[in-house]
A protein has these predicted regions:
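Nucleotidyltransferase catalytic core that binds NTPs
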Residues: 1-204
């Protein structure tokens, strides 16, 4: 894991927010800010490769530039990149960097939580074993998440402000390509950078 922005103080509780961030949206920031009510620091992680998708449109360097702008100097936000992509891999990397005394959570939306719980890990660590390393913080996006009883005590739901639950990166890209309004879906610094690199959003 390579840090690009590092918060100053060692957190007792850390939330890891992995994503493709294509582009970062107001929903990403709202998730992180809501998580700060229960953790000390949020670590945004942009993988250099993804387990279930490939890079298209804006590349790694541009997305990292957008993330730097989106975080806006919040002293409780950190930013890192990783050659890994699975939640358990990122959590173990964070454990190496933050130490055994830091309580780890992975922050995600309901759709991602449902995927990780049901994913076939091919004989590797199942979700119960992974949740021995980290908890899940699940933002109530696109409906409430009701986790299976065996892992319910390792999953915490966090609320999002009204109006951001349905915002997604794919919606931003679709609106840009369709010539529809999109600026209110992303932080203002991100919108300015997108305007400067519009060719990546019109093609990807």
């Amino acid at each position: 894991m390579e840090f690009h922005i590092r918060a100053n103080q060692a957190p007792g509780k850390l939330a890891i927010l992995p994503g493709a961030f294509n582009p970062p949206t107001r929903a990403h920031l709202a998730m992180a800010e809501s998580a700060l009510t229960v953790v000390d620091e949020v670590l945004f992680v942009l993988p250099r490769a993804f387990p279930h998708k490939e890079y298209s449109g804006a590349g790694f360097d541009i997305r990292m530039e957008l993330l730097r702008a989106a975080l806006g100097g919040n002293p409780r936000f950190s930013l890192a990149s990783s050659d890994r992509g699975l939640f358990i891999e990122l959590a173990l990397e964070a454990r190496d960097d933050y130490g055994a005394d830091t309580q780890l959570s992975v922050l995600c939306g309901r759709d991602a939580a449902e995927r990780i719980v049901s994913w076939d890990y091919g004989g590797g660590d199942n979700i119960e074993r992974q949740l021995e390393v980290f908890d899940l913080l699940v933002a109530a996006r696109s409906g409430h998440y009701d986790p299976p009883p065996p892992i319910r005590n390792r999953i915490t739901s966090i609320a999002l402000p009204a109006g951001v639950e349905e915002i997604s990166s794919s919606e931003v890209r679709q609106r840009i390509r369709a010539g529809e309004p999109w600026h209110d879906l992303v932080p203002a610094p991100v919108a300015r950078l997108i305007e400067q690199r519009m060719e990546f959003w019109l093609s990807g």
